[in-house]
Every structure is written in structure tokens, then in C-alpha cells.
């Protein structure tokens, strides 16, 4: 666990340059807390309660070199803090990707880890680690899924109720094509031999995501790639309904994509593709609900260079998904960063907010509620650089806990003085440090300290109307409540009744 003192000083210095916002508008607590991942270079992570104690745990794939530490498991101990990593070896060289699901139906989360396999064929480029039933894991079982696994996902692609594994192989052993491998699950933690689908580009595919893109109830696939002209694309593989993906369709993404995720960012009920690029921008391709996508729209992230990961989550409590992007991939001290792009509400995004993560490179980011306060937090696989004594060079996990936004309430009257029995409307307007105030939050109104009623927010304001004020001078107060996403605030106005 993190120590204090010098660490805090070093982090604070880094964040003064990395974060162009006041402490009043912070979405996440600074500085982040940094843990060692148990390996040489944390590359990918997932969050799940692997020991079923009700507290989220972090699982880290620890890099692509021999002796890298395989996969590390950091048990959560409450409050968004974690124990030291327990590590488990994988079957070949290193671990570049990890996914978590119950693979054998025993109710306990298991692990699938993708590795840089090697040049022999077949190679155990996938390692399956079954949970022992206490959050620790059995020895890895190997499966061949290609040469260089960069991304893995778990989904029931053939509709038999058993989880299957999808793995993205960046390059075959001849370095000619990227491919996606599908391993159908048997329901007992074992899998059939991989069925592979060659992609349309060369050896440029880096990331995959899965979701039902056309509403048929079957998971489809989206992958980042580049075509033969070097244009950034996403490739869409629609499920035939039985777990086969024979057709590949490409869409220009406007960027060479390093990471892709799927989610409904514009609120139309259809999955959209969000692509982080190698050039510092993020592309949004709106889904049409039939497996096709609209033209990409690009947004700057404020991160110069190769972005590494993108995740989505509602960070400000307005009911719309926001974006978190990690990067850039540059080997400089305390270079790791994440960019937060708040959704405007219709799938467009505000200017980025930048947070430093304290390490050399931020390789992967996940959004999860780590301390069970109902507000999303961030976990970043962040290679350490040796500048922090409690995190020497090697793999690190940076934790940024979410904090409620400061709010400001103003209160106005429809007219003062008023006559006895006359209708008077009091309007409380609430502004948050980041993002809009959601509709439906109940604001309480008081007259000289006595509660007189409530009104729900609508478009950032709550209006309360009364005719019951007695003759005299009244101090009316509107109180906006605290919540996981917002701090409380209040305001008063004087009302004279003749």
C-alpha cells in the first residue's frame, strides 16, 4: 500500500502541471494511490469480486516479457484500498490482456489471460485460471489462439448459455494478418479448439469489444485495425447466430485505433463505438442499431501521442456515459495520464480534464465503484518509473477515487414585496463544478428555518410556489442535498409580505 511523505510531494508537483482545473472542480481525489502489480509492466486490468467478500478486487496482466509476473490479483479491503498483489504464472512469456467471468458455472469468477505466444504452432497463447472457490486460482490451462494476443473478451456467442472466449491475435507467425479467434466454451472451464477469422487489414489490430449491435440478441464483434492504405478503421463481425463470424465490414474511424469500447453514448438505445487513437484523439462512431455505424466524429483528448485505452461510465451522475482515456505511450518520468471527457447529454463531449497517474505509462483504465459509495472510481494499469520509493520500476496500479462535485445554489423570488395570499414562486438554481445537475433531485425549501415543501430539479433549477406566507418578513432557504455525486449547498432570499 502507498506510503506518505515524499510520494505526496512528488505527485503533487506532477499534478500541478497535469491538471488544468481547481480543486473545487475535481472529479477524482488527488494524488492517486499507487500499488505494485506484482510484475514488471502492468498492461491490462479488470475489476471483479474474485473472493466474493462484497469488495471489488483488481486483476492485472503484467506485461509481455519473460518473468513479467503473469497475472496479479489485488484483493480489495474496503474504502478503495487493496492488499499487495498475489501473482500467478501464465503459460507463455507474459500477459498482455485479461478478462474475468465464471467459466465453469460454480459461481466464482475465473480468469482468461492473453499472451505473446511465440513462433511455434500451436502455442499456449491463452491461459485459463480457474478460481479455487476462495479468490485464489489453480494452475493455468493453455489454449492456442494465435501468436500475439492483444485483447480478450468473454461472451456467450453461440447462445448455449456457456461463456466463450474471443481473442484478438495481432499477428500470425508469418506477420501477414491479424485475426480473431473464437473458442467455444463447454461450460466446465474448458474450451474447444479456436476457430479463427482473418481480418481485412495487415498486422494492425490492437483491440476488440463485444456487444449486440443489431438487436438479434447475439454478441457481435468490433475491432480496431488499419486498411492496406494505412487508414484507421474498425472492423465489424456480425454474429450469424451460432457463434460464427464469416462476414467482416470495415468503417473508417478517422484514427489509427489502439483501443475500442462499445456503449450507448448518445442515448438512443443503440451501441456506439468509441475508439482511442495513436494520435491523441478519440473517435465516436454512432451505431445505427442494425450493425452499421455512422461517420466518425473526432474529439481531442488533451493527450499528445499514442493513447492506450478507453473506458466509459457515468462520472457525474447525469445518467449519460462519459469517457476516460489513458495515455500517452511515452517513456518519460510521471508521464502517465488519463483524460476525462464529460458527456453533454447527446453524445457530444466537453473539453478534456487531465489527471496524472504518477507512473511512466498509463496502459489501461477501468471505471468501477471501488469503495461502494455509489460513485465511479478509476483504476489504471500504470507502469512505475522508480521515482516513487514505494513503487520502484515495474508494474503499478493507480487508484483515483471519485469525489462529489462542489455545487453552488442561488435563490430568487418572483417578487418582493408581495401581498398576503398572493402566489409567490421561489426558484433555486444549482450549478455543479462539472456537468449538469440531473433532473429529479429533490430540493427542500424552508421559511425561517421551518420546512415548507420540496421541489424536484428540472434543467438545473427547482421551483417552489406558495400562497401561505403570513404578513411579515421571511427568510426563505433552498437546500440542495448531498449525494455520492454532489456536495450539498444552499441559498437564502428575503421575502416581504404586506
Positions of predicted regions on the chain:
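Blade-edge motifs of beta-propeller repeat domains
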Residues: 24-40, 75-93, 130-147, 184-202, ...
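Hydrophobic beta-strand segments that make up the repeating blades of beta-propeller
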Residues: 58-62, 111-115, 165-169, 221-225, ...
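A short loop-to-beta-strand structural motif that recurs across blades of beta-propeller domains
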Residues: 69-73, 124-129, 178-183, 232-237, ...
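Solvent-exposed beta-strand/loop surfaces, strongest in extracytoplasmic domains of secreted
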Residues: 403-498
Amino acid at each position: 500500500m502507498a506510503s506518505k511523505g515524499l510520494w505526496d510531494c512528488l505527485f503533487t508537483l506532477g499534478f500541478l502541471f497535469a491538471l488544468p482545473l481547481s480543486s473545487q472542480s475535481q472529479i477524482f481525489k488527488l494524488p492517486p494511490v499507487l500499488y505494485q502489480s506484482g510484475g514488471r509492466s502492468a498492461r491490462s486490468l479488470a475489476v471483479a469480486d474474485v473472493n466474493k467478500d462484497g469488495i471489488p478486487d483488481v486483476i492485472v496482466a503484467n506485461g509481455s516479457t519473460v518473468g513479467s509476473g503473469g497475472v496479479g490479483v489485488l484483493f480489495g479491503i474496503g474504502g478503495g484500498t487493496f492488499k499487495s498483489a498475489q501473482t500467478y504464472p501464465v503459460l507463455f512469456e507474459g500477459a498482455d490482456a485479461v478478462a474475468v467471468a465464471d467459466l465453469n458455472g460454480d459461481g466464482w469468477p475465473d480468469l482468461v489471460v492473453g499472451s505473446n505466444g511465440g513462433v511455434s504452432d500451436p502455442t499456449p497463447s491463452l491461459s485459463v485460471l480457474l478460481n479455487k472457490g476462495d479468490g485464489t486460482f489453480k494452475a493455468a490451462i493453455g489454449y492456442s489462439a494465435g501468436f500475439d494476443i492483444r485483447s480478450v473478451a468473454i461472451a456467450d456467442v453461440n447462445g448455449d448459455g456457456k461463456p466463450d472466449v474471443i481473442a484478438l491475435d495481432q499477428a500470425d507467425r508469418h506477420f501477414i494478418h491479424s485475426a480473431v479467434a473464437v473458442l467455444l466454451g463447454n461450460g466446465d472451464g474448458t474450451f474447444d479448439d479456436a476457430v479463427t477469422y482473418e481480418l481485412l487489414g495487415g498486422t494492425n489490430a490492437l483491440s476488440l469489444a463485444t456487444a449486440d449491435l443489431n438487436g438479434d440478441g447475439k454478441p457481435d464483434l468490433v475491432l480496431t485495425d488499419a486498411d492496406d492504405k494505412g487508414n484507421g478503421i474498425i472492423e465489424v463481425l456480425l454474429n450469424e447466430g451460432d457463434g460464427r463470424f464469416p462476414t467482416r465490414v470495415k468503417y473508417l474511424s478517422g484514427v489509427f485505433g489502439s483501443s475500442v469500447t462499445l456503449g450507448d453514448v448518445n442515448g438512443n438505445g443503440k451501441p456506439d463505438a468509441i475508439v482511442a487513437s495513436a494520435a491523441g484523439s478519440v473517435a465516436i462512431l454512432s451505431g445505427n442499431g442494425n450493425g452499421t455505424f455512422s461517420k466518425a466524429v473526432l474529439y481531442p483528448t488533451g493527450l499528445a501521442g499514442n493513447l492506450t485505452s478507453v473506458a466509459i461510465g457515468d462520472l457525474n451522475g447525469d445518467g449519460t456515459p462519459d469517457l476516460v482515456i489513458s495515455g500517452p505511450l511515452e517513456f518519460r518520468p510521471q508521464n502517465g495520464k488519463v483524460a476525462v471527457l464529460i458527456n453533454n447529454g447527446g453524445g457530444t463531449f466537453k473539453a478534456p480534464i487531465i489527471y496524472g497517474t504518477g507512473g511512466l505509462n498509463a496502459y489501461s483504465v477501468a471505471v468501477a465503484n471501488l469503495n461502494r459509495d455509489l460513485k465511479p472510481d478509476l483504476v489504471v494499469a500504470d507502469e512505475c518509473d522508480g521515482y516513487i520509493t514505494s513503487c520502484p520500476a515495474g508494474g503499478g496500479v493507480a487508484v483515483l477515487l471519485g469525489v462529489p462535485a462542489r455545487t453552488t445554489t442561488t435563490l430568487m423570488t418572483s417578487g418582493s414585496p408581495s401581498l398576503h395570499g398572493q402566489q409567490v414562486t421561489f426558484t433555486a438554481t444549482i450549478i455543479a463544478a462539472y456537468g449538469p445537475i440531473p433532473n429529479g433531485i429533490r430540493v427542500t425549501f424552508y421559511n425561517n428555518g421551518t420546512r415548507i415543501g420540496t421541489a424536484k430539479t428540472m434543467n438545473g433549477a427547482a421551483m417552489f410556489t406558495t400562497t401561505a406566507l403570513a404578513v411579515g418578513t421571511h427568510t426563505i432557504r433552498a437546500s440542495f442535498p448531498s449525494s455520492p455525486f454532489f456536495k450539498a449547498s444552499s441559498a437564502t432570499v428575503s421575502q416581504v409580505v404586506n
